[in-house]
A protein has these predicted regions:
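A short, well-structured alpha-helix characteristic of acyl/acetyltransferase catalytic modules
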Residues: 1-51, 161
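Active-site rim helix/loop that mediates acceptor-substrate recognition in acyltransferases
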Residues: 42-61, 70
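Conserved beta-hairpin
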Residues: 62-77
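A short, internal acetyl-CoA/4′-phosphopantetheine-binding micro-motif in the GNAT/acyltransferase core
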Residues: 67, 86-101, 126-127
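Conserved acetyl-CoA-binding loop-helix of GNAT-fold acetyltransferases
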Residues: 98-113, 134-139
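Conserved beta-strand-loop-alpha-helix junction that forms the acyl-donor binding cleft
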Residues: 123-134
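Conserved acetyl-CoA-binding loop of GNAT-fold acetyltransferases
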Residues: 138-148
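C-terminal "cap" of GNAT-fold acetyltransferases
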Residues: 147-161
């Protein structure tokens, strides 16, 4: 995906290659509470691990920065990857967590997947202790599709209507 996806006047998805927000992202991924929700371990990222993660995500899907407009400026607040095999989403800036922004992003990506004619979307793993994320995905119709060591996999069947 090579274009900006405008969700509303204050929220957008910026293709990863259009900006370098890795310095800000590193601060998110050094928060051990956030990393535990993402990776299941309380081990902060270093620059090398962050770069490896983004390199992997960029090769396996459409990687975006989640940006929020505040006082006329677009600020990076998280990242998300649209892939048929996984939908990792992180609102990394704590000031923007638990405000429904992840729901808006997820809704937009589900619509985009439908427009592309995809038949399903998968979430490889949500840890059992990540109740907020699981509730968010389930609210859009994702259902459990398997068990993992620390959680569950989810699946959403899409129709093109």
């Amino acid at each position: 995906m090579k274009q900006i996806i405008q969700i509303n006047s204050s929220l957008r998805l910026l293709p990863y290659f259009l900006a370098d927000h890795r310095d800000v992202a590193l601060t998110w991924y050094q928060d051990v509470d956030l990393v535990e929700l993402v990776d299941g371990v309380r081990s902060p990222y270093n620059v090398e691990k962050l770069n490896a993660m983004y390199s992997y995500l960029e090769k396996h899907g459409d990687l975006f920065w989640i940006e929020f407009r505040e006082k006329g400026e677009w600020l990076p607040i998280g990242d998300v990857t649209l892939s048929q095999e996984n939908l990792p989403i992180v609102i990394g800036n704590p000031a923007y967590q638990h405000q429904g922004l992840g729901r808006k992003v997820l809704s937009t990506l589900i619509d985009l997947a439908r427009q592309r004619g995809w038949k399903e979307l998968k979430v490889q793993e949500i840890y059992d202790f990540n109740h907020v994320s699981r509730r968010c995905f389930e609210s859009f119709g994702f259902v459990e599709s398997g068990s993992t060591e620390k959680g569950t996999s989810l699946l959403l069947k899409l129709d093109s209507n």
